[in-house]
Amino acid sequence: MKSVAVMLASALMTAAAMQSASAQAPAAQPAPNPNAPVYVVSYIDAQNALKSQTMTLLKQFRTACAKEDGNQRCEIVQRMEQQNEFAIMEVWKDQAAFKAHAAGPGAQLRDKLKPLLGSPYDERIHTGFAVTAPQAAPSGRIVYAITHIDVIPVPQFFDKAPPLLNAAAADGRKDAGNGRLEILQQIERRTNHFTLIEIWSNKRQLEAHQSLARTIQFREQLQPLIGALYDERLYKILD
């Protein structure tokens, strides 16, 4: 009974902290630098019966997107478990380039995809939080790990997250098999939301990284600061 009471008290304290988030939210972040790169991650959930049509559209979009002015990266990946789910990762040199894309080819893609989807197109716009210069994905049968991290927007939680995230990025890039490890921060009213993107030469290398003591410690230290599941999903390049 005592353990149940302790668990209930802990849950109530966390709920109370989250309820007061609007009153204690971190100070508003400055407007993004219009000349800084814009990082976009979009999640796509196709109807299973329409997966092939979705894949065709996404491949066409990837080819065209890479040729647009200001595009620095356009990658499309397919989830390894639920293969009707996809993610698009784009980097644009500045806000002007992104807005031009969003108003043209980006809007056209959404219109074409809409009848094929099982849930709405989910686009997340970010700034770079812990990133390296945009580069092409390494060759081979690589594995992408994309993780959404939702930090509780209360200073006692939010202020502790950046040092943990920065250290995890710096350490992870040194691990065998890592081709990219970057952390993005959403803009405007969702600055407590982060996206962690990793590329590994194969799944075995990813699993070795996940089993390291410091990786486990990072997740243990981060867990009390987040308000949702540590949502890691594995993908392969759409081919």
Per-segment meaning from a language model:
Residues 1-4:
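Positively charged n-region of N-terminal signal peptides that target proteins for export
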Residues 7-17:
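Bacterial N-terminal signal peptides
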Residues 8, 29-34, 60-75, 91-124, ...:
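An amphipathic, aromatic/His-enriched active-site/gating alpha helix that lines ligand/cofactor pockets
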Residues 19-22:
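Sec/Tat signal peptide C-region and signal peptidase I cleavage site
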Residues 24-36, 75-85, 109-144, 148-152, ...:
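Glycine-rich beta-strand-turn "strand-cap" elements at beta-sheet edges
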Residues 43-45, 89-91, 150, 197-199:
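Short hydrophobic/aromatic beta-strand micro-patches
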Residues 45-56, 150-161:
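Short, surface-exposed ligand-recognition loops at beta-strand->loop->(often short) alpha-helix junctions
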